[in-house]
Amino acid sequence: MIVGRDTQSLDEIGVTKAAVETVAENTSDGIIAPLFYMAIGGPVLMFFYKGVNTMDSMVGYKNEKYLNFGRYAAKLDDILNYIPARISAWLMIAGAKLCGFDSKNAVKIFKRDRYNHASPNSAQTEAVMAGALDIQLAGNAYYFGKLCEKPTIGDAIRPVEKEDIPRANQLLYVSAALGTGIFAVIRLGIQGLITLL
């Protein structure tokens, strides 16, 4: 399962939006945040982060089965992702410029819609993605058979199309490359300081 929403009733546009949103969120959760924690704390901190993030993905849903345990995983994940999500958003804005996407709109939508999500972090990168691609993401969706009313992210400057998935992937790759370079320099700097002590 890549997305948490119910997929049975999704049409091509719904599947595309879900995929693009997943790429946006995983730019932070799956790439930039682990690199950030690797840079500042080495492998131990990176694996701790990934453990918490995986627990949130598996049991962080608001349902009766995981309510007590999942709540703590979700809150800790929110705390650990607070800084990396914002770094990811700015790396994606730079990546949008390098990819030739709409970086000005990415900044505009980021500033306006970055809190249009129940999580304090998820819409950070989704807002940049929506703005960079000139599309509208999020909105109402079904989870575990129940309709969840959610605000939209971005403006529908143009309709969502399946080609937005490779565009989203391109933005992920460029943002990841930028992050890898920056965090490698930070990690080398920290290791250099440690050897001097």
Identify the meaning behind each predicted range.
Residues M1-F48, V52, G60-L197:
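Hydrophobic alpha-helical transmembrane segments
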